[in-house]
Amino acid sequence: MKSNIKDNRKTKQKDIEPKQSKLNKIKWKKIKSKQIFAAILSIVLVLSGLWLIQALVMPKYMHGIVEGAMIAEYYKEDKNHDVIFIGDCELYENISPAVLWEEYGINSYIRGSAQQLIWQSYYLMEETFRYEKPKVVVFNVLSMQYHTPQSEAYNRMTLDGMRFSFSKIKAIQASMTEEEHLIEYIFPILRYHSRISELEKDDFTYLFHKDKVTHNGYYMRVDVKAAGTVPKGRPLGDYSFDKLAYEYLDKMTALCKENGVELVLVKAPSLYPYWYEEWDSQMVDYADRHNLKYYNFLDVTEEIGLDFQTDTYDGGLHLNLSGAEKLSRYFGEILQKECHLPSRQGEKKLEESWEKKLELYYEEKKTQEEQLSQDNNL
C-alpha cells in the first residue's frame, strides 16, 4: 500500500516537473520579450530625441538668407517637368517658370542655389534623373570659372537641402573645404549643436514644416536699383577653364545623352560677375564640338528688351521680376521653337496645379509692390 502511494507521488511529481518547466520557459520568454521591447523603445526614443534636436538646431532659412531653403522644395513637386534648370543665382533670380507656363505651356522647375558649383550641379542632375526625365535641362555656365571648393556657408545652402542618397554623398565629397567633415553633413547635429543656445522664434515655428520661398524655384524681387557704370573685368593670367570644370561638364553632357535629355547651355544677362569674351569663346567651341545649344543672353539684351535702369534690383547682378519676366518670354520662345516643346495647357491636372501656383505668384507680386510703395513713401 505504501509502495503504491510512493509510486503515485513520483508519478505526480514527474507530471508537475514538465509543466513547471514549460511555465518557466513561458515566463522567461515574456520577460525577455519585455526587455527587448524596452530596449527597442529606448533606442527609438533616443533616436527620435536626437532627430528632434537636429531638426531644431538646423538653420531654417525662412527669413533673410532664404536661399538655403530652395533645394529641398523640389521634393514636394509632381515630377513631370518639361524643363529643369540647374545652376546658381543667375537662373533662380532671372527665370520665371510662371511666365513659361502662362505664355508657352511649358512646365518647368529651377533647381538652383547660391553659388552652386558645377560638381554640385552635376550631382543634382544625377539625382533629378532618378525622379524624372525632363525633355530639356538648362545649365548656366558661370560656374565654369570655379575648380576648387569655395565656402562651407554656400556648400550648406546646396547640400543640406538634398535628400540622403549616393548623389548627395558624392556631392559632399567633391565640395568640402579642408575644414569640413563628411560626418557633419550626414549627421548635421554634429555641426549645428552649438545653436541650441542661440535658437530663435523661426526655429520653433518651422520645426515641422517650412513655407515656400520660391515659385517653382524662382526667387521673386520687385524692387529696383539701377545699374551704374560696370567696369571691365581685370585681366587674367590664364582665361582657360580648368580641366575639372570641363570634366564635370563632360559628365553632364554624357548623363543627358544616356537619359535622352537635351542639354542646353546658357549665360544669363547679368552685368557682373564679369563674363570674359575668352570664356564665351570656350563655351561656343564646346557647344559646337558636342552638338549642344548655347545662348549668351548678354549678347541680346536689346532684343530681350532689358533696361538695366529698371529691370534689376541690385545694380545689374540679378534681374528683378520685370527683367526676369522679359527674359522668360524671350527664352520661352526659343525653348518652344528650337527645342520643340509643345504647350501642355489643357492638361487638366497640370492646369489645376498651375492655377494655384499662379494665384500665389501674383499674390506675392502684389504684396511686394505694396511694401515697396510704402517704403518709397517713408
What positions do the PLM features span?
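Membrane-embedded segments
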Residues: 86, 90-172
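Alpha-helical transmembrane signal-anchor/signal-peptide segments
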Residues: 56-79
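Hydrophobic membrane-insertion alpha-helices, especially the h-region
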Residues: 37-55
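Secreted/periplasmic serine-hydrolase-like ester/acetyl group-modifying domain
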Residues: 154-259, 347-378
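C-terminal regions of proteins
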Residues: 277-352, 356, 360-378
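Conserved, well-ordered alpha-helix/loop/beta-strand core segments that scaffold catalytic motifs
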Residues: 136-148, 207-304
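Acidic/histidine-rich helix-loop elements
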Residues: 108-114, 237, 241, 316
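N-terminal Lys/Arg-rich, disordered targeting/topogenic segments
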Residues: 1-34
